[in-house]
């Protein structure tokens, strides 16, 4: 009966002593079967002595209860520990001896209680553990892993600085029947939040012990620059993250404000043909910003100008020359080329499979002067000529209803319009008199208010 432990440092195969310690073997096998040990840390390493594991959270977690037996998982916290009888025949004489970590019972000091944690010896003849730990197995494969664990860097409490964890457990042979209520997971469960919170240095993180602080700082800056370049690529400021500035462009600064493009080109043209020379100016005022970009035809000419023109006096100003770090022109040309390519592809947004959404009610698109075809397309409505003539529905039911209207309806409408237009002259005269009387009363009221105001001022 054997169990394979897949750790972050390698595989360990354990043969179980079923006849000598049946209860401890059953507990260990069933805990492995329900994947209880997955992601459990090796939380204690004592060099040339033992290492201890089996608590899924480890002592660093405030939620840890020290582990539980399989019966505690199935029946509750009352059965979290179980009693073990230590066999006097089993001794810790060989390296790789596997035993359950035990504590004395509070009721009987001679009784030993165990849960899920177990110990693996890293040295021979450790008789100190006899009578304190219950042996139930031996390591038969993976002694190189034991050497790696023995040489791990640890803190003052014996905990590895870099995590050593059990990743998986595989049962090679199980002679025991499953207890009632035991559910075997279909796949290995993911680590819980409490387990992830105990990670110090991840077991898959690579560390270079020979790297000095300066090299590590340089590596950190390179990673940060790469991340920033990737961010600029994502927002569209760079055509791609690995873009480099052109090597045939010089950056010239500390220029005199009166220096012109032609003057600068004439001075630098002695090193070779110049494709462009531009003094950067303010867009609003046109004043020189006192720096320029000079693009040479050849890279060698650009390098020669860099070495020869550093600190040269131009128009009473000593200039500073450096290689251009700008990729703005590159980005602009890349954007223009990309946009033109997309426009030639057809479709919508440069994707031939896409089509602009048409918002319409009618399904047929043959009608030429359809006033209500587009629901929200205001641009189409503005471009469409306005027609004053009234349009009627093409539905046969509505057209027949319109034709079958009563002729009296139009007659009543015309009669009302004629009645409103032909008022009697007497009524119109009465309206005029009423308006005159209202205006006269308003004038009297205003005069009365003015007189009252004057009397108050006199008092």
Curated annotation (Swiss-Prot):
InterPro entries: CRIP (IPR035542), Cyclophilin-like_dom_sf (IPR029000), Cyclophilin-type_PPIase_dom (IPR002130), Cyclophilin_PPIL4 (IPR035538), Nucleotide-bd_a/b_plait_sf (IPR012677), RBD_domain_sf (IPR035979), RRM_dom (IPR000504). Residues 1-171 form the PPIase cyclophilin-type domain. It is found in: Nucleus. SUPFAM superfamilies: Cyclophilin-like, RNA-binding domain, RBD. It comes from the Eukaryota. Keywords: Isomerase, Nucleus, RNA-binding, Rotamase. Its EC number is 5.2.1.8. Residues 377-392, 417-459 have a biased composition (Basic and acidic residues). Residues 407-416 have a biased composition (Basic residues). PROSITE patterns: CSA_PPIASE_2 (PS50072), RRM (PS50102). Residues 376-459 are annotated as: Disordered. Pfam families: Pro_isomerase, RRM_1. GO terms for cellular component: nucleus. GO terms for molecular function: peptidyl-prolyl cis-trans isomerase activity; RNA binding. Coiled coil: none annotated. Residues 248-326 form the RRM domain. The keyword Isomerase applies. PPIases accelerate the folding of proteins. It catalyzes the cis-trans isomerization of proline imidic peptide bonds in oligopeptides. This is Peptidyl-prolyl cis-trans isomerase-like 4. The gene is cyp6.
